[in-house]
From Swiss-Prot:
Similarity annotation: Belongs to the TRAFAC class myosin-kinesin ATPase superfamily. Kinesin family. KIN-14 subfamily.
Keyword Transmembrane helix tagged: no
Gene Ontology cellular component list: cytoplasm; kinesin complex; microtubule
Protein name, UniProt field: Kinesin-like protein KIN-14B
Regions annotated as coiled coil: 56-97, 434-476
Domain Kinesin motor: start-end pairs: 103-425
Glycoprotein in keyword set: no
GO BP of this protein: microtubule-based movement; spindle assembly
GO terms assigned for molecular function: ATP binding; ATP hydrolysis activity; microtubule binding; microtubule motor activity
Residues binding ATP, per UniProt: G182, Q183, T184, G185, S186, G187, K188, T189
Length: 830
């Protein structure tokens, strides 16, 4: 500290004395108070000496601490530069390692036997590290080659050890795709989700992403999206619900290309996430909305492809390949054939759509493997969505699952054939043994180099952390702009004033690039097919004026959070707990429509949301170890506004809880409450639920408990018609008319059931004025036959007589033809 402040304190009495000369015209009390202040500030000579010594000591200490701080800062700058260089080397080594293994790799996993399956089945497979030998006959075997084979005793950790390097490359700026392929019941969902005690690829991969990002010196923005492709339509599983459209009116999201050549899905919800628990919560919400149905292969078969996208954005990171990368984890639909499912109707169409998209995926991967000039991305919505994540420098993994059961042999052969096609194995492409040995040696060296560089990065990060703690001890805690990448802590008011012009320019560029020529615009038929004619494009949609108050929350509907019996990552969760989050009161569910569709709405708005504070654990949040300038924060804010990224809490809180209930995973609308007055007005006894009592000869409704006043004649007529079985319930009576004397009488007898006066009719042919309620004196049968006789015409009588004569002639001819003549019948009478 400089000695200037101490000198100023010593000169303060003289300064105040000089000021008194300019203020003599003021009151004497002010002059007296200033004099007391001067006396208090005037130190004695010993006190002055002590103060000077203290000032000199403080100045020396501050000079020494400033030197230490400067030294620590220089070391931090050097270590950060060294860490950036080593991180770049690690990225290049890992990329070379994966390129040497192959950008498109295919693994095979054989699930173990179920308890209900026969263990006495003959062994179909003979395995080694990279080959599957299938025994198709007693003396015939067929070989299938893979990059890695996992037997029936392999664990989830064994599978993830091969997947982990690919997931790490997503942090380096590369797009990654991980597929799970196989027939229904072969273990796809178990490999991807796992169980709470044995997590699968999806939860392990997400945990790895957050752990690696927390150890990195860069800040990352993670966004989570979840969608399904059902019968060629793209459906957002995280879109806010709307009760204006039913399940059958859900439109398909459209696919667009951005100026950088990437693929963007229009109106797809992207939610910012900061921890594994937030991703887990969103994943559980999305899996309950998947389209599932019962087939011969599985009672809860998925009827669509489920795609999970995690986008990673890190600006000003020179060691990354791209600023934004994508990690796709896809649970494909079952690849079983029609012979296996025996599906008809809608299930048949769903199976066709799944197999067509799987075939298109095989064509694309085969074209990429063989480096064909044309790659057929446009043959399927699945390949269109993944276009920027399959080719170029992207990393792709295909996990093929097969069943050991002998009953699934045909499906196993088809699955292995698809895997062989994806790997593009050719006889002439087999490498010589010397080349294979050299490749294996190089892989081992690169793997060891990657591990060494990772350990070196960890040591440097540890040193940086210790130096930062030392600096904090010397200078105290320094306020930073951001301590994590949670976008909810952004100072939006400051950023709006600084970057409004940049955001406006970026929006204008995006709108200009989204305009299509006339010949490229969709036709009316295509818009009707994908459901675009029911909504207005976002670029042409006018924003409503901002109301003074918040918009009523009845615009959107949210799900009822039903308790899930199964564990969150258990494979059965996606089928048993699947339900529709909202209900449309105008939609009537059909019996034939057995598929549980994932969406009830098409129109929704981009919203900003976040998790509750108690769910944000500090150890799960990714923190940065260096202070970043405000320019990077502005760039991230611009990136968020350009892509329409939303936060998770506001998005969840702005939805409305709609009352829905489920019955066997089917959507059932809640029965609206009915008042007692409405019951009196609208209750009509059903003709099929009437019961007669012998004591009072009254007709009662079994369901409503309503009494019908009817005469004894009519009650006996009902009993007689039951014995004769000639009249139906529809012919006997019609819904009675309600006769009230006045509305006041109804209000006065609310606690009593109203009395209904029945007006019966005997048949539909009788006229109303000829009906009588008097008890007939003759037998009912003769009475009805007499009426029928009067109603019979001459033509009817003639036709009956002719029919009788014709039958008699036929009988006579028949007896003569078999030798039974007049003598035979005469002998019978003797």
């Amino acid at each position: 500290m400089d000695v200037q402040p101490a000198r100023t304190m010593r000169n303060l009495p003289d300064t105040l004395s000089s000021l008194m000369g300019f203020n003599k015209h003021l009151t004497p009390s002010w002059i007296e108070s200033v004099s007391h202040i001067i006396d208090g500030l005037s130190p004695t000579k010993p006190q002055m000496k002590v103060m000077v010594e203290k000032d000199e000591n403080i100045s020396d200490d501050n000079t020494e601490s400033e030197a230490k701080v400067q030294k620590i800062q220089d070391e931090l700058v050097s270590l950060n530069a060294q860490l950036k260089q080593i991180t770049l080397q690690r990225r290049e080594a890992l990329n070379n390692y994966l390129d040497l293994k192959g950008n498109i790799r295919v693994f095979c996993r054989i699930r173990p036997f179920h308890h209900e399956e026969s263990y006495s089945s003959r062994n179909l497979f003979t395995l080694d590290e990279s080959n599957v030998f299938l025994k198709v006959a007693e003396t015939k075997r067929k070989q299938y080659k893979f990059d890695k084979v996992f037997d029936q005793f392999s664990t989830q950790g064994d599978v993830f050890s091969e997947v982990e390097p690919v997931i790490k490359s997503a942090l380096d700026g590369y797009n990654v795709c991980i597929f799970a392929y196989g027939q229904t019941g072969s273990g796809k969902t178990y490999t991807m989700e796992g169980k709470p005690t044995n997590l699968g690829v999806i939860p392990r991969g997400i945990q790895t992403l957050f752990n690696q990002a927390s150890e990195c010196n860069n800040r990352f923005l993670f966004t989570f999206s979840m969608l399904e492709i059902y019968m060629g339509n793209i459906r957002d599983l995280l879109a806010p619900r709307s009760k204006t459209n039913g399940i059958k009116n859900v439109p398909s999201l459209s696919i667009k290309s951005d100026p950088d050549g990437g693929i963007e899905i229009e109106d797809l919800v992207a939610v910012t996430v900061n921890s594994f628990q937030e991703v887990k919560r969103l994943y559980e919400m999305g899996t309950r909305l998947r389209s599932t149905a019962s087939t011969m292969a599985n009672s809860t078969s998925s009827r669509s492809h489920c795609l999970i996208r995690i986008s990673l954005t890190s600006l000003n990171a020179t060691e990354r390949r791209k600023a934004t990368s994508k990690l796709w984890m896809i649970d494909l639909g079952g690849s079983e054939r029609l012979v296996k499912t025996k599906a008809t109707g809608k299930r048949l169409k769903e199976g066709k759509a799944i197999n067509l998209s799987l075939s298109a995926l095989g064509d694309v991967i085969d074209a990429l493997q063989t480096k064909k000039p044309h790659v057929p991305y446009r043959n399927s919505k699945l390949t269109q969505v993944l276009r920027d994540s399959l080719g170029c420098e992207s990393k792709t993994l295909m996990l093929v699952h097969i069943s050991p059961d002998e009953g699934d042999l045909c499906e196993t052969i088809c699955t292995l054939g698809f895997a062989t096609r994806v790997r593009s194995i050719r006889l002439e492409s087999e490498e010589p043994p010397e080349m294979k040995a050299r490749k294996e040696t190089l892989l081992i060296d690169l793997g060891q180099k990657v591990n060494d560089l990772e350990h070196e990065c960890e040591d440097i990060r540890r040193k940086i952390k210790n130096l930062e703690e030392s600096m904090e001890h010397l200078t105290g805690p320094q306020p930073t702009i951001y301590s994590n990448f949670d976008m909810s802590h952004l100072s939006s008011e400051e950023l709006k004033t600084d970057v409004s012009s940049n955001v406006r320019n970026s929006k204008n560029r995006r709108e200009a690039s989204s305009r299509l020529p006339r010949f490229m615009k969709p036709t009316a038929s295509s818009q009707h097919r994908i459901g675009l004619n029911n909504r207005t494009p976002i670029i042409n949609r006018l924003k409503p004026p901002v109301p003074p108050r918040r918009r009523p929350s009845s615009v959107y509907a949210e799900s009822v959070m039903v308790p899930v019996n199964a564990a969150p990552w258990q494979s059965e969760c996606s089928s048993e707990c699947s339900m529709s989050l909202t209900s449309d009161m105008n939609w009537t569910p059909s019996i034939r429509d057995g598929t549980e569709c994932s969406q009830d709405a098409s129109e929704y708005e981009i919203k900003q949301v976040i998790f509750s504070e108690h769910e944000k654990s500090s150890h799960d949040q990714v923190t940065c170890y260096t202070d970043y300038p405000l320019a990077e924060s502005r760039d991230i804010q611009i990136k968020i506004e350009e892509k329409g990224i939303v936060d998770i809490d506001n998005w969840l809180h702005q939805q409305i809880v709609e009352k829905t209930s489920t019955f066997r995973s089917k959507m059932v609308l809640d029965i609206p409450g009915v008042t007692e007055a409405e019951i009196h007005v609208s209750s009509i006894p059903s003709p099929t639920t009437m019961a007669c009592t012998k004591e009072d000869s009254q007709v009662k409704d079994e369901v409503m408990g309503l009494t019908l006043q009817s005469s004894t004649d009519y009650v006996e007529d009902i009993k007689q018609s039951k014995t004769d079985n000639q009249f139906t319930a529809k012919e006997l009576c019609t819904p009675p008319f309600k006769e009230f004397s006045s509305n006041n009488e109804v209000k006065g007898h609310k606690n009593e059931h109203p009395v209904y006066h029945g007006r019966p009719r005997r048949s539909l042919q009788e006229e109303l004025e000829n009906c009588t309620l008097e008890k007939p004196n003759m037998d009912s049968k003769s009475h009805r036959s007499h009426d029928d006789k009067h109603k019979t015409g001459k033509f009817t009588k003639f036709f009956q007589a002719l029919q009788t004569a014709w039958i008699g002639a036929l009988l006579a001819l028949g007896t003569v033809s078999i030798g039974l003549e007049h003598g035979f019948f005469q002998s019978l009478t003797l």
